[in-house]
Amino acid sequence: MIALVQGRVAAIGLDAVVVVVGGVGMRVLATPATLAGLRVEADCELHTSLVVREDSLTLFGFADADERDVFELVQTVSGVGPRLALAMLAVHTPDGLRRAVAQEDLAALVRVPGIGRKGASRIVLELGDRLGPAQGAAPAAPVAVDDGADVVDALVGLGWPVRQAQDAVRGVLEDADGTAPDAAGLLRAALRSLAGDARG
């Protein structure tokens, strides 16, 4: 099993990063939050999980070992594969998932694309207390992002032109109707906007 990858970032996409290790470029799928912390040509360290299928080998990368361990544990639930597990961690932090399961918060779980109420109930039932208690303090209320500068930097690091990144962040903030998204939420919304523009 490949549990850790250290190397130079060669390229960053919307859902994956290419890390050069010993002259070999390894494509690693990751969440937007993990990708936002990487920079092209910079060194990185990712905790990884290798998913082996009959016709493929897919590497998933995470900012820390806890996130990787939660990714692997949620896949023990029937119907939850690696892609859905990654989507869960794109929407929730590991502690966010722990709280949702412990509190049987189905509404929080169905916010993940691909999970309905029946699937959320199954996740709560099958995981039970296996995720363990939350390791950090409860999340603070969302903090207003004044100008989205950090998110713009993250989008530029993902390969988007500065002007396009600024326009996407500005559009999300204008559509927020006075609510204050946190940085991760703003990044996800901006990525959706940019992906829609690219398809259009």
Swiss-Prot record:
Gene Ontology molecular function: ATP binding; four-way junction DNA binding; four-way junction helicase activity
Any one Gene Ontology BP term: DNA recombination
Region (Domain III): 143-200
Function description: The RuvA-RuvB-RuvC complex processes Holliday junction (HJ) DNA during genetic recombination and DNA repair, while the RuvA-RuvB complex plays an important role in the rescue of blocked DNA replication forks via replication fork reversal (RFR). RuvA specifically binds to HJ cruciform DNA, conferring on it an open structure. The RuvB hexamer acts as an ATP-dependent pump, pulling dsDNA into and through the RuvAB complex. HJ branch migration allows RuvC to scan DNA until it finds its consensus sequence, where it cleaves and resolves the cruciform DNA.
Family: Belongs to the RuvA family.
Gene3D superfamilies: 5' to 3' exonuclease, C-terminal subdomain, DNA helicase RuvA subunit, C-terminal domain, Nucleic acid-binding proteins
Cited CDD domains: UBA_RuvA_C
Keyword hit for Thylakoid: no
Official protein name in the record: Holliday junction branch migration complex subunit RuvA
Alphabetically ordered keywords of this record: Cytoplasm, DNA damage, DNA recombination, DNA repair, DNA-binding
Chain positions covered by the region annotation Domain I: 1-63
SUPFAM superfamilies for the chain: DNA helicase RuvA subunit, C-terminal domain (SSF46929), Nucleic acid-binding proteins (SSF50249), RuvA domain 2-like (SSF47781)
A UniProt-annotated Pfam family: HHH_5
GO-annotated cellular components: cytoplasm; Holliday junction helicase complex; Holliday junction resolvase complex
Subcellular location: Cytoplasm
HAMAP family registered for this protein in UniProt: DNA_HJ_migration_RuvA (MF_00031)
Keyword DNA-binding on entry: yes
Notes on the domains: Has three domains with a flexible linker between the domains II and III and assumes an 'L' shape. Domain III is highly mobile and contacts RuvB.
Major localisation: cytoplasm
Gene that this polypeptide is encoded by: ruvA
Region (Domain II): 64-138
Residue ranges, annotated region (Flexible linker): 138-142
Complex and partners: Homotetramer. Forms an RuvA(8)-RuvB(12)-Holliday junction (HJ) complex. HJ DNA is sandwiched between 2 RuvA tetramers; dsDNA enters through RuvA and exits via RuvB. An RuvB hexamer assembles on each DNA strand where it exits the tetramer. Each RuvB hexamer is contacted by two RuvA subunits (via domain III) on 2 adjacent RuvB subunits; this complex drives branch migration. In the full resolvosome a probable DNA-RuvA(4)-RuvB(12)-RuvC(2) complex forms which resolves the HJ.
